[in-house]
Structures are given as structure tokens and as C-alpha cells.
Amino acid sequence: MRVLYVNQTAQVSGAERSLLALLEGLDGRVERVVACPEGELAAAVRELGIEHEPILGTQASFRLHPVHTSRGLAEIGRSALQVRRLVARLRPDLVHANTTRAALLALLARNRSGPPVLAHIRDWVPEGRFSRFVLALVARRAAGVVANSAYIAGQFDGLSTQGPVRVIHNPVDLQRFNPRSADGGSIRRELGLDGDATVLAVVAQLTPWKGQDDAIEVVADLAGRGREVTLLLAGSAKFASTGTSFDNVEYERRLRALAEELGVGERVRFLGERSDVPEILAAADLLLMPSWREAFGRIAVEAMAMGTPVVATNVGGPPEIFASGVEGLLLAPRQSDLWASEIEQLLGDPRRLADMRERALGRAAEFELSAHATVMLGCYQDLLARR
């Protein structure tokens, strides 16, 4: 079976990491070709020994704009034409679109005799006319729709799809995220932190909806309670084009200013983009996920696989990953005083924290990569059997 994977951006964030994991998990079972722009993702694909085909791609926003929308539509049109030519040349059995935007490219590229398109929806689409058009197009024309959480699948409520929307949670590579092989002490030594220092971490792209500003406020609230902690912010302002929904570069500047303003500038460490995420998670006592609208929360599973409990918002995907009070805590978003209070109590109860670590390890094993790849392969086979 030959599958053409389509991704609209060269940047590597959560959706792309999940794609790379799937590609690795399918090794030897599927002939894989990836179409995406040149850049970080293309390099990672080639490093896996997988064929890469370059396309223009797009970072078009789903929000309408008098200038950016027309540019985005032009990018989408040119990229769709490139995908159509690739399909004609490569003759794949199936096209797997890795995101909502990638699904738009693949569906616009498809002709009636072309291979079926599987739309893998991993992102929350903002309200708006263009968003409604895209979701309706995906529902009507995709041979199959997979969502990475029930929360994301809910975007298709009321829309008629060719089959049921399947919820398949993102996987974790338990060999890479292994507490026996990752040295958290190396991170603490790099940052000059004592072994008994309390460390919190947020691992995410720098963008407002990820809530790093709320995490900084939690650190300030904890300091006001006499609990000194260090916050590690791992991630960068990846999506910084004029067509994106937020000014992420400006957001990073505001985060740095906020830390200074609240008097915790020395307690907040901006680590930038890091490849040693397992070590960062091993160094942390808790992973914070203060996102407003997390589609799934892959980093939560990775933290749990490292035995690091997670404190996340109770909206979006995290409630599907773990139970509050069992493997971590689920709290209302944007309430730093509540978060500080709950975190202070948890850190002050070593037995409870140790129990959460053990339960987190057990739960993370349920997201194992090989099983995920097998489920996805079955999804491919089901779609092809329906042709």
C-alpha cells in the first residue's frame, strides 16, 4: 500500500510530531511518501529514510482578512495543484492529510477518479464563515475523517460525513520517553538548579492559547505564598507569519516583560526550541498545560510516560488523557490563584505526588506507538475496502 502524506507547513509542532511518530510506527507496513514544504519537517522525514516531495504549503489563517485571506487562498490554490500533480505521478492508494489545512489542499486537489482522502483533524478551527466552509468540505468530500480527540471530533457534529468520525488519540514513543534513560539531572545542572529545587515546565509553542502567561502568574502567586519554584518554558514562537491568528513574536516579548513585572524574571527560564524534551520532563516535578483549547495534549502523555504528573486545563483534550486527582490535576483555565493553591497542596504531599507518578506511568502505556500505527493501518484498509 502506498500512502501520500500531506502537511501544509514545514514547521514541526504537535501535529507534525504525531505524524513523524506514525510514519516511524508504520515502517515496513506502508510505502510512505510525504508532501510538505522544505524545512524542518522535510529534514526530519528524510532522516527517517522516507521519500519527500516539496510543495509550497500555506500558513493561511481561518479568519478572514482583507489582505492575508487573498494571499492564503493563492497559496492554497498553488499547493493543491502541486498535490494533484504528485498524485498523478506517484499514484498512491490513499492520501492522508495530516491537518485541517492539509485536508483542504488534498480535497481541492482530488479528481473523481483519484485515491480516497483521509482527513486527520488534529486542530481546533475557530468560528467563522471560512472555517464552516472548510469543515463542511471535509465532511462532504473526505472518504474518512479521523480526529485526535472527541473534543476535536465534536466540530463535525451536525455535519454529514461519509462514515463515522473516528477518534484515534495521538501516540507516545515509549522508547524515547523512558524515565530509565532520560537524565533530568543534566538539565538541572545546565540551568544551575539544585537537585531539591522545585521545577515546573511548560513545553509548547509560544502562542497565547497555550497559556504561558497564566503559568508565569502561577509562579508569581506561588512566590507570594512563600513557595519558590522555577518555571521552564520550552518552545518558540514558531508560527510568525502575518497570516497567523496571533502575533506570536510579540507574545514572547510580552511574556518576558510579564515575568519581570511580576518580580519572577529570575524564576522563569526561556529555553527556546529543544530536542531534549524527555530530559526536560524528567527534570520537572510537574508539567503545566494551561492551554485554553488544547486539541489533544500530546505533551501530557509524554510527561506521564516519564512519570511526571500533569496539571492541565479541564477543557479540550486533556480530560480524555487522564483523570483529575488520579494521574494529575484538571483545573479551570485562566485562574492562577486556583492553580497556585492546588499546586502548593500537591507539592506539599509527597505520598500523593508519588502515587500520581506511578498511575501516570501506567496510563501512558495505553498510548503506545505500535498499537496506534496498527489502528491507523486498519483505518486505511477499511477505507480502501469501501472503494
Regions found by a protein language model. Give the residues of each.
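A short helix/loop element that forms part of the nucleotide-sugar donor recognition site in Leloir-type
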Residues: 178-193, 254-255
